[in-house]
Amino acid sequence: MWITDGDSQVPATSILIDIGPDFRSQALKSSINRLDALLLTHGHADHLNGLDDIRIFSHTGSKAPCGVNGQVKLYPETEGDGLPVYGNSNALQDVHQRFSYIFQPVLEGGGKPKLKTVDCSVFSEDNPIIIGDISIIPVPMLHGHLETIGWLLLKGYKGVGFGPCRGIAYLTDCNKIPSESLALLRRFGPYLQHLVIDGLRQRPHSTHFSYDQALEVALEIGAKQSWLTHLCHDMSHVQIQCYLADKLSQLKQDFQCQPAYDGLVLEI
C-alpha cells in the first residue's frame, strides 16, 4: 500500500506499507519516485521479499572497476542514516536475518539498500510516528500465533484529546485484534474515511478473518467506508460484492463495505 500526501505527481510525503516480491513492477506502474519510510505489518514473504528493490530510493555507496585500464567508478551513497523501516521485533528480526547482507560492510561493486530499522513498540497514541504531516500509530494484532502490526495513519492529528482529524486504518493479515487495539480503533473510528481489513474468504481460517468476521470488526470500528483485502480466489470480485451486499442489506445501520482490488485509489 502506497500512501502519499500533497501533489500526486510530486508528493510531499511518500510512505509504503509492506514490500512484496512484485514491488518493482508495482512501483513502475504507479510511478513511485521517492520514499520517506517503509512500514511493515510482518515478515512473511508476500509482505517483505521485495526489500532489495528499495535500493533505488536509498542505497549505500559502492565502487566498481570499469574499462580496461583498471579505472574505478564510484557510486555515491544516499545521504542520511538510511530509509527508516518500522516494524515490530518479529518483522525486524526477519529483515536482519533474511537480508543480512544489507547490514554487512559494502563489498566491491555491490550497491545495496541503505536502511535504518526502527522498533515500532516505542510508538503509541501518545507518541505517534511523525512523517511529514502524517501521524502514524502502530496497532498490535495477531495472525494466528504471530504478532503483526496494523497501521493507523492520520492527517491533522493533535494528540490525545484530539480535535477533528481524518485518516485510514490498514489491518491486513490478522484473525484477532486484542481488546486494547480494538479500543484504540474504535476511538478513531468516527474520523476514519477508510478501513482496509483482512478478509480472506467466506469460510473460517486459522490465521485470517473470514468475510463475516471482518464485517463484524469493521462494524465495531465504524469507519465511513470499509474494504476487504488479502482476498483469496474462492469467489470472484463480483461474487464477493454480491455476498457483501446481501450481508449489508440485513443491517439496519448505514454501513459500506466492498472488496478491494489492485490499483484501488482511496482519498481522505
What are these model-derived regions, one by one?
Residues 1-171, 175-183, 237-268:
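Binuclear metal-dependent hydrolase catalytic cores
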Residues 178-268:
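Binuclear metal-ion centers of metallo-dependent hydrolases, dominated by the metallo-beta-lactamase
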